[in-house]
């Protein structure tokens, strides 16, 4: 079973963070727009169970993603199942229709501009995202995807990189939660 080990931090100065990442040998990509359409479950409250179901549009690619509840009190570590939706916009629309037919209802769309980098750190390749989230703010995310038996060392690795980048004030709420709080 695969888990996403993630830490997210508010970022007042993305340019300064990009410079720190460059100093670590990481090249930051150009901006890419991402739109996440989140769904509510017909029989349980995802806000209470700390789960999420979304369809992400990233350029001409689409993904269906389920995120399970966070499993600790300090990071955003959780089970993640992500499926690519081949067939572009038509397939994403078909999945949206299927989910609606099953009783799932759209909750909100999260719009962001994301730049990515990968940092080699403690023998791992950590994915770093610099995010500008519409109506929410700017953030940096550090992420590893690992098997269950590797969770503790992965969390320590991500925390170590966060310390090296002088990041503080971790944010455990999702962009959806932050957006809905501002609505």
Which residues are covered by each model-predicted region?
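A structural feature that tracks compact, well-ordered secondary-structure segments
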Residues: 8, 52-56, 65-69, 128-133, ...
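Helix N-cap motif at beta-to-alpha junctions
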Residues: 10-15, 87-90, 147-151
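Charged, well-structured binding/catalytic surfaces in domain cores that contact anionic ligands
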Residues: 116-136
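Charged surface patches that recognize polyanionic ligands
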Residues: 16-18, 22-31, 45-49, 54-118, ...
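Mixed-charge, glycine-accented linear interaction segment located at domain edges/termini
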Residues: 147-174
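Short proline/glycine- and acidic-rich turn/helix-capping motifs at secondary-structure junctions
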Residues: 35-42, 114-117, 172-183
């Amino acid at each position: 079973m695969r888990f996403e080990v993630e830490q997210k931090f508010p970022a007042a100065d993305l340019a300064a963070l990009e410079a720190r990442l460059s100093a670590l040998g990481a090249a930051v990509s150009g901006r890419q727009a991402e739109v996440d359409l989140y769904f509510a479950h017909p029989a349980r409250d995802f806000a209470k169970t700390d789960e999420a179901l979304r369809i992400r549009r990233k350029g001409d690619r689409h993904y269906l993603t389920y995120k399970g509840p966070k499993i600790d009190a300090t990071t955003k570590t959780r089970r993640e199942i992500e499926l690519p939706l081949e067939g572009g916009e038509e397939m994403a629309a078909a999945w949206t229709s299927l989910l609606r037919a099953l009783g799932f209802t759209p909750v909100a769309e999260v719009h962001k501009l994301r730049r990515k980098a990968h940092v080699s750190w403690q023998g791992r390749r950590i994915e770093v995202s610099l995010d500008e989230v519409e109506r929410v703010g700017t953030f940096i995310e550090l992420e590893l995807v690992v098997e269950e038996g590797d969770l503790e060392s992965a969390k320590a690795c991500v925390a170590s990189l966060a310390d090296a980048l002088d990041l503080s004030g971790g944010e455990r709420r999702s962009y959806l939660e932050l957006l809905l709080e501002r609505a």
